[in-house]
Amino acid sequence: MIMKKSAFMLLIILLSLTANAQTPYHNEDGKKIDKEELETKDYLPEIHGTIRTKFEYQTEMAASRFEVRNARISITGNVLPIVAYKAEIDLSDEGQIKMLDAYARLFPIKDLTVTAGQMRVPFTIDAHRSPHQQYFANRSFIAKQVGNVRDVGVTLGYKFGTGIPVTLEGGLYNGSGLTNQKEWHKEVNYSAKAQFLFAKKLNLALSIQSIQPQEVRINSYDIGAFYEFGRFHIEGEYLYKTYADNAYDNVHAVNSFINYDLPLQKVFSKMSFLARYDMMTSQSDGDRKSVV
């Protein structure tokens, strides 16, 4: 099936209710604890959860539906000050149960992290947002289709710089996703990402990925940036994907949006006004027998 998708969405009003967990370390992804030895309370895991439901109406079909888009639960904690862990499962990803993250994270030296297990690979900006961090009810095509990659492997991360903080991430992975972990691989599958933080509010991210999940090697390149000032958040991202031996047409994907937050005093914390341009050309998962 060939899909050519282009969408422009304007949300006039989006009400957002936020709740902040009162935890000592806010350890959502696995962090280092600055202690030589852990106290009893430090061994207690943190539990995080997100439930997201929605109602959709299809004007062309004159039909509607309710859906539980996400019901995520994650557990994070530490077994040593420099050894953290995370396990996350989605009990209802459009009706499907999916194991998302299952990894251990080490902090061997200052500013260096080593993560091994099942995780989201370092690639793109929007795909790395959890459901409670997303700006729109529906994810962009980059986050959902062409850049949404979780895999099993190892990732190294390093932070440096004071004037312009830089975060580098890169790793090696199976390349076949989460369900085919028993397969043996001869090819090298990797992903890398560099983030530059300019003037505290301007973030630039560059990503590259090369995988061979099926019969055809796929090379992807991504550049994105966002700028925050006052109550505004402006973001743009472009992804370019190619296939070895010109097996399929090259893929282009764009996600750009602007967000303005209006603080509220009662019940809800804010009201957000958003506009987005979101598009993707035809793409394939690398299997010569099918195109999506």
Locate predicted features.
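Cleavable N-terminal export/targeting peptides
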Residues: M1-K31
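Intrinsically disordered, low-complexity Ser/Thr- and acidic-rich flexible linkers and loops
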Residues: Y25, D29-K35, P263-F268
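An N-terminal domain-start capping segment
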Residues: E28-I33, T113, I218-N219
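Outer membrane beta-barrel
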Residues: K35-G175, K186-V188, Q195-N203, L274, ...
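Outer-membrane beta-barrel and related beta-rich outer-membrane complex signature
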Residues: M99, D126-S130, N180-K182, I218, ...
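Detector for outer-membrane/organellar transmembrane beta-barrel domains
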Residues: H185, Q195-D285
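Conserved small/polar residues in nucleotide/adenosyl-binding loops
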Residues: V291
